[in-house]
Amino acid sequence: VRHGVALVAALLTGLLAATPAPAAPRIAIIIDDLGYSRPAGEAVIALPAPVTCAVIPETPHGRRLGRQAAEAGKEVMIHLPMATLDARALDPGALHEGMSEAQIGAVLDRAQTLLPEARGLNNHMGSALTAEAAPMTRLMDQLRRRHLFFVDSRTNAATLAERSAHRAGLPAGRRDVFLDNRRDLAHINEQFNQLLRLARRRGHAIAIGHPYPETLDYLRQVLPLMEQAGVEVVPVSRLLAPPAASVGAAPRPPGAALTSNP
């Protein structure tokens, strides 16, 4: 605990010493993989900031947590399982290679029935599917009809998902930083600092984390410090580029690297 307090104190000192940005930098934090554990999901919902809750639909507690998150004023996303390069087993309700647009639509119908509060979608795993043009085009066409936004988790550096979303006319964005691909406090602190550096440099940045005890303990300590540090925490939908802004845009530099989240 002392080590954690020292890290947070050092973080705050660094933030306050930084040159103020012309406008408050904005960060969004998506917490993925909600639905397996009710206590972990409720701990995410209780975090002292508008984090975005990404819920896997076909999980034991997904439906309840989606409702609770919306009631608490948290933004809800569908965290949809998608095919991976290593062909690992997927949760029910996943998107697989070779699905027709009608089949993809049926998966989304079920997901929206379970999570009617969801305003958008991001990929759970998906290192194979997000790199294929045809299924991404089919998916984004379906999301457009449903007025859902899309965030690319970037589990494959060759992903086509964000570009496909913009071509389909969706508000879309991408993950810049994974907070907790290593579950230790020092690494999470390092990644959070990277998030803040990106936000200060370009005005905004998006992070993805998970409902791990280490991540939640860290966020409970650091999120209340953001206002004093001049950083605004917002739902991810507020950071998404409109379609015309990013078609053909160059990739963002930092934060786009592949990590161990297939």
Regions picked out by a protein language model, each given a short descriptive name:
Residues I31-D33, C53-P57, I78-M82, N123-M125, ...:
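A cross-domain feature marking catalytic cores of carbohydrate-active enzymes
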Residues A6-L16:
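Bacterial N-terminal signal peptides
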Residues A23-A89:
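Active-site beta->alpha N-cap acidic-glycine motif
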Residues A69-E117:
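Substrate-binding cleft of extracellular glycoside hydrolase catalytic domains
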Residues V231-P262:
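C-terminal accessory extensions appended to soluble enzyme cores
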